[in-house]
């Protein structure tokens, strides 16, 4: 099925004549196209080679870039890479400068531990006396419906 079939080469002037936006040019200008455009083989072309069984695959050759494209494609940065400047406030308030290099001092958190009485009276024994808060129990009766 694939014996003796040649690979067709589309000349660049034919591609330019198909698009009326290019106009009539005396020079061989290339259109700015995407790399993955399947309809315009921009810097690569296939050599016309007869395809036979066990034949070598046609090699892709690089065309010399005599006429560079007129449109330069710049990469579009993603929103995560764009630096947004802070908003300027209308009123001129002085912002106090906070020293971020200073060491952070730990804040003391009050704990709810029982208070230990360490005062020793001569009449008392040598044991520590712990005072616990007094609790009162109140019986709550719910009305039965």
Curated annotation (Swiss-Prot):
Location relative to the cell: Secreted
Tissue specificity comment: Mammary gland specific. Secreted in milk.
Site-annotated residues for Cleavage: 81-82
Top-rank lineage group of the source organism: Eukaryota
Residues carrying a glycan: 107, 112, 118, 125, 141
Residues modified to Phosphoserine: 125, 142
InterPro entries: Casein_kappa (IPR000117)
GO terms for biological process, alphabetical: lactation; protein stabilization
UniProt KW keywords: Glycoprotein, Milk protein, Phosphoprotein, Secreted
Family, similarity comment: Belongs to the kappa-casein family.
Biological function: Kappa-casein stabilizes micelle formation, preventing casein precipitation in milk.
Protein name: Kappa-casein
Species annotation: Balaenoptera physalus (Fin whale)
Lineage, broadest ranks: Eukaryota, Metazoa, Chordata, Craniata, Vertebrata
This protein's encoding gene: CSN3
